[in-house]
Design a protein with these regions (language model features):
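Glycine-rich phosphate/pyrophosphate-handling loop used in enzymes and phosphotransfer proteins
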Residues: 1-199, 203-233
Length: 233
């Protein structure tokens, strides 16, 4: 039997319906943040079905990656970009967690998650983290962690401040400079572990390349990558 609170909630919803953070349309009562239409229609990559997918190929000859997967394809001016804009710039960390939940659930059926021991997010610069208040990649990782029951080490990697200008540097020098911008906080935590490093959007993969190689050099057994989205080149 419906209570007064139920009727009040329905009345408030009619007056002030929530908007989907992807398409901007009205979301139904009971839906969270993203409407069911967007959830169904988002451009999925299905990279978990193809180990030699386009994201994995970005790292060929650059970093030894066990698996490289992304949930969605990123397209400028598309609904995925709109959703990620809210995640990164509009104080909506719940978007990252929700997407992590969805992706984690979709990968449960083939036991893909059993390949990993620890989830580590790509870190933000400390100043950016203080300004934003959260790491969007860690929000995504939190969503995966809750579904897969795998721990996330939010500070497993840290961004430090002593990188120098990339101007006039060779590609190798730029790479070494970028890698010097990260540290492994506790090498014992990752030693002989199968690490899943998570990111929001992958473009060139340069940042991930530096993080992957640093983790391997610090004792990780394997390193894999999972991202919310990847750009199509």
């Amino acid at each position: 039997m419906a209570t007064f609170k139920d009727y009040l909630s329905a009345f408030v919803y009619v007056l002030f319906p929530d908007a989907c953070l992807a398409c901007g349309g009205v979301i139904e009562q009971g839906e969270k943040t993203i409407c069911s239409v967007c959830r169904v229609s988002f451009p999925r990559t299905n990279f978990h079905l193809d180990k030699d997918n386009m994201l994995a190929q970005k790292f060929w000859g650059r970093a030894k990656v066990e698996y490289a997967i992304a949930y969605l394809f990123f397209k400028k001016e598309g609904d995925v970009q709109s959703m990620l804009h809210y995640l990164k710039y509009k104080d909506c960390p719940e978007v990252g967690t929700l997407i992590g939940n969805w992706y984690g659930q979709e990968l449960l059926e083939n036991d893909f998650y059993k390949n990993f021991d620890v989830i580590i997010p790509v870190p933000l610069h400390p100043k950016k983290l203080r300004k934003r208040g959260y790491n969007q990649s860690a929000c995504f990782g939190e969503g995966l962690s809750k579904i897969w029951k795998i721990p996330q080490s939010e500070n497993g990697l840290q961004k430090v401040t002593h990188t120098t200008s990339q101007t006039k540097k060779s590609r190798q020098e730029r790479y070494e400079n970028m890698k010097a911008g990260f540290i492994v906080r506790n090498p014992e935590e990752i030693k002989d572990k199968n690490i899943l490093i998570v990111d929001d959007v992958v473009t060139t993969g340069a940042t991930l390349e530096a993080c992957i190689n640093l983790l391997l050099e610090s004792g990780a057994k394997t390193v894999s990558v999972a991202a919310i989205a990847v750009t199509q080149s």
